Amino acid sequence: MSDFVLTCESAADRTREFFASRNIPVVCFHYEIDDVVYTDDLYQSITPDEFFAQIAAGAMPKTSQVSVGEYEEFWEPFVAEGKDVLHLTLSSGISGTYGSACVAAQMLADRYPQGGKVRVIDSLAASSGFGLLAECAADIRDGGASLDETAAWIEEHKLNLHHWFFSTDLSSYLRGGRISAASAIIGTALKICPLMTVDCEGGLSPREKIRTKKRAISEMAKTMMAHVQDGADYSGKCILSHSACREDAEAVAALIEELVPQLKGKIEINNIGALIGSHTGPGTVALFFMGDKRVD
């Protein structure tokens, strides 16, 4: 039995059942649609299809990070009982939540000098990639590692976690300032599906402009083959997430499972959560796996 509590955030885009089964408490982000604030509660109060249908109909969600007070409230029961906490945050290259978490951890340390301590790690990850890193951390913890040992493993390996994604709908990327209006118009006209990644600083980085979804799916699989250490003999885990385009995710999964038959289990396909989905909109497919280190 581990002697610490492993926690993370709703932006990790895994199911409620997954987090419960791995004993990982989750703190939730928030989003706002038409002046109404909602909790990013892992689709407990709304379905993914309903959420993305609102965006497709013109809704423009605004997101907000977890506040210092919410972190305090989330961790205080553990700290007050003398339990140490290891917390993983959404990438600092995407959100300012890492800074808020660090402030809250210090405030609890001041309030409970004899209580448990909270150690905060910037995951430099997002969506189900963040969730895959949390799963790896739980595996290390459940293998008997201490908090310090688990934290050291995460810090050493978090840049081995790859994120690759493409989108067939550039509307939300345009609204969020990820691409220019000209790029969106040209991209839509030419059926361009930009291939993007999360770089070594945890920020979003466009890599290739690919014409047609079919080619984007093929290129995504080739990119994975180029970054996993054992190529077709890769035996690690692979996860996909999507925003209201499961058939596209299934096409990627089928191709990768054909190319990499030694994968650890079938590829898990998740829904992109409401926080990340507020920025991607519908039409995004994302691939996550452990490979060589991200260097740019």
Model region roles, listed by residue range:
Residues 45-52, 75, 80, 107:
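A short glycine/small-residue-enriched secondary-structure motif
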Residues 34, 93, 202:
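Positions that flank functional sites
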Residues 89-91, 121-124:
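Short beta-strand->loop
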Residues 56-92, 99-103, 147, 151:
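Glycine-rich phosphate- or other oxyanion-binding loops that anchor nucleotides, phosphorylated ligands
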Residues 5-70:
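N-terminal glycine-rich anion-binding loop in soluble enzyme alpha/beta folds
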Residues 3-5, 11-30, 97, 101-106, ...:
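Mixed-charge interfacial surface used for oligomerization/domain docking
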